[in-house]
């Protein structure tokens, strides 16, 4: 069969998004309207435009996990403020929470670009590379999936230069890799850029892969093919 194209009216301007845990619903940021547009790909229709309560949502692909109160959820951070918005995604098992913002977590600051978790991890990681506060640009925030009301559980400063951006888990879900944006002019100082490998359980740095010029997205093939995030 030839592929078909379905035009679905949503919101402005669609940029970055990912699947819910069932791979039926696609959630995408409408960053000019501070909303997440949710598409039912089975019925090929818009389910909802959810107000995120933040400014300029930027989820990357977002993060999926099962909350003890709200059931399956998906989350996004924001460029314009410190809000992490959590949206229910289970219309069958938790209809009262589905396609609504069910909770917020306060990040360290504005300037978040990516949020990441893994089914085998208890943590959700957020970056702040375009924060107005320089110290936060190289600091990751971590919160507990089972206790979102507890807010940020721990912070981890991963470099003394540049900006920390885009976390990615390994296949096992026990390491998280983060890029450091550096500067080519500082290559002789070892500050052109690198990837930092972190132990997810202990939240400590295991190793560094140095001398990379502004590495950004890193995608584990196993996780990416299966939309694990």
Where are these regions (language model features)?
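Predominantly soluble domains enriched in secretory-pathway, periplasmic, or organellar proteins
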Residues: 1-229
């Amino acid at each position: 069969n030839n592929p078909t194209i379905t035009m679905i009216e949503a919101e402005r301007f669609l940029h970055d998004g990912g699947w819910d845990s069932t791979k039926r619903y696609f959630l995408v940021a409408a960053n000019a309207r501070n909303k997440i547009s949710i598409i039912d790909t089975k019925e090929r229709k818009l389910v909802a435009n959810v107000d995120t309560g933040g400014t300029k949502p930027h989820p990357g692909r977002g993060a999926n996990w099962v909350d003890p109160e709200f059931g399956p959820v998906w989350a996004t951070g924001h460029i314009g403020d410190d809000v992490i918005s959590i949206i229910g995604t289970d219309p069958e098992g938790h209809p009262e929470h589905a396609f609504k913002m069910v909770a917020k977590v306060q990040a360290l600051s504005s300037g978040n670009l990516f949020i990441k978790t893994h089914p085998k991890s208890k943590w959700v990681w957020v970056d702040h590379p375009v924060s107005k506060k320089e110290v936060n640009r190289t600091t990751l925030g971590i919160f507990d999936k089972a206790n979102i009301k507890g807010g940020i559980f721990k912070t981890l400063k991963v470099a003394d230069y540049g900006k920390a951006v885009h976390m990615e888990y390994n296949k096992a879900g026990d390491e998280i890799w983060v890029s450091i944006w550096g500067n080519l002019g500082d290559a002789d100082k070892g500050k052109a850029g690198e990837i930092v490998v972190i132990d997810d359980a202990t939240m400590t740095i295991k190793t560094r892969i140095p001398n990379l010029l502004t590495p950004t997205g890193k995608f584990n093939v196993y996780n990416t093919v299966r939309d694990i995030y």
